[in-house]
Amino acid sequence: MKGSSNPRRCFFAASSLRRKFSLTLALIVAASLLTIGCKRNSNLDIGFMDSSNTNNTNQTTTTQNDNTNVKGMADKQGQATKPDKGNFTVQYSNPRNPKYVQLNESFKRQRLLENIADEINATIAIPENVAITFKECGQPNAFWDPKTRSINMCYELMEQMTEDFRSVAKNEQDLNDKVNGAMTFAFIHELGHCLIDVLHLPSTGREEDAVDQLSTFVLLALNGEEGERMALSGAISWGIQYDKIAKSGKTAGELNMLWADEHSMDGQRFYNILCWIFGHNPEKYMSLVNHPLPEARAVRCPQEYTKLATAWLTLLKPYLKDGGAKASAHTQPMTGNMGNSNGGTPTK
């Protein structure tokens, strides 16, 4: 974007909030890597990366966070024009699997989820309380439960992502970073479902695609390259699933069920997220064109990114508190030469 505005300024407002949010998720994933051992077995080529509802039982609400600065913003109406009558709160489950019990106790001790809740409360005004929980679900999953008004992140998903990314990570730190990014992407995706429901936001078209767009946009708005790497990890997580399906030998009936699902196919999600990352900064990510992003799609990606960013900011603007008031700087992609939106040849 031309001019004095900084398109990399944090969606969650002050950079201190962004750093704390990213650190929180990094610590969560680091804890998971200490307790979950996985095998390496995938042939997916990601060389370009180098540049079900369940019962909510036995849950208790935590006490208030001691982070007074963030909590102060969380408790204020701020610049939001819609009333702020609710809060994101934290609930802890009682997992049965010993390795999940250890994680759960670590989360409680370090108050990691409370920090996330307070930072979101400093950003968005909501009319009712919403719970955030990590829990044992019986399968890899993350979901918004409209009945219990809760965002649910499953320990099994963290374990699956650790296993999947171990097959492509260069070392333990790279594994940590990739799982951190993909889990953050999944959380913001479910937060998007929550906001559409709780705020009664209009969603024309497929809601699953809309919240993928929100997650990508929020991550790309982070300072520096950290958010871009997280968004790339989100894309790669779907690329890995796509690779698994391609090699699974599923029957026609099983594939038909995938086509009929409310989500886009894993491969489509992979390419969509890559497109929006490229559209955000074509010059930086020109290497993605044809490796693997098709050129015919790439020429339209800057316009796609601008539209999705503008749409989400328009929907959320009345609800953005002091912690989210700077988000309007992110509506345009970075400067780049990609021809026009009706087709053109990328400059290579």
Language-model segment annotations:
Residues S4-L25:
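Bacterial N-terminal signal peptides that target proteins for export
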Residues L34-G37:
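C-terminal motif of bacterial Sec signal peptides marking the signal peptidase cleavage site
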Residues L220-F278:
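Active-site/pore-lining binding-face segments in mid-to-C-terminal subdomains
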Residues T204-N223:
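An active-site-proximal "capping" alpha-helix that borders the catalytic cofactor pocket
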Residues N176-I196:
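Short alpha-helix carrying the canonical HExxH Zn2+-binding catalytic motif
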Residues D75, T81, G86-T89, G253-K348:
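Pan-zinc metallopeptidase signature
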Residues R40-N152, L157-S167, L316-G344:
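A metal-dependent hydrolase signature that marks the N-terminal structural subdomain at the beginning
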Residues E128-W144, D212-Q213, E228-I245:
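Acidic helix-start/capping segments at beta-turn-to-alpha-helix junctions
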